[in-house]
């Protein structure tokens, strides 16, 4: 029974350490400014479409 908490703690420590493959994959994935620009642009596009489509249903594509 004494080994169980030690075993669980070791499993948690091993699971929390990122591997090299994960770090290399996410380093060059997407530049942060581009991601932030897309995050701001998407709600703006949705709000523009909502304004257009609310009074005129025919303008929705």
Curated annotation (Swiss-Prot):
InterPro entries: T-conotoxin. The modification 6'-bromotryptophan is found at residue 58. The keyword Nuclease does not apply. Its main location: secreted. Disulfide bonds: none annotated. The keyword Disulfide bond applies. Residues 22-48 form a propeptide. It is found in: Secreted. Contains 2 disulfide bonds that can be either 'C1-C3, C2-C4' or 'C1-C4, C2-C3', since these disulfide connectivities have been observed for conotoxins with cysteine framework V (for examples, see AC P0DQQ7 and AC P81755). Keywords: Bromination, Cleavage on pair of basic residues, Disulfide bond, Secreted, Signal, Toxin. GO terms for molecular function: toxin activity. Belongs to the conotoxin T superfamily. The lineage of its organism: Eukaryota, Metazoa, Spiralia, Lophotrochozoa, Mollusca. Expressed by the venom duct. This is Conotoxin 3. GO terms for cellular component: extracellular region. The cysteine framework is V (CC-CC). Residues 1-21 form the signal peptide.
């Amino acid at each position: 029974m004494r080994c169980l908490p030690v075993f669980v703690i070791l499993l948690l420590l091993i699971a929390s350490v990122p591997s090299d493959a994960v770090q290399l994959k996410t380093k060059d994935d997407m530049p942060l400014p581009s991601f932030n620009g897309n995050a701001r642009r998407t709600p703006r596009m949705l709000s523009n479409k909502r304004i257009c489509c609310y009074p005129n249903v025919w303008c929705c594509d």
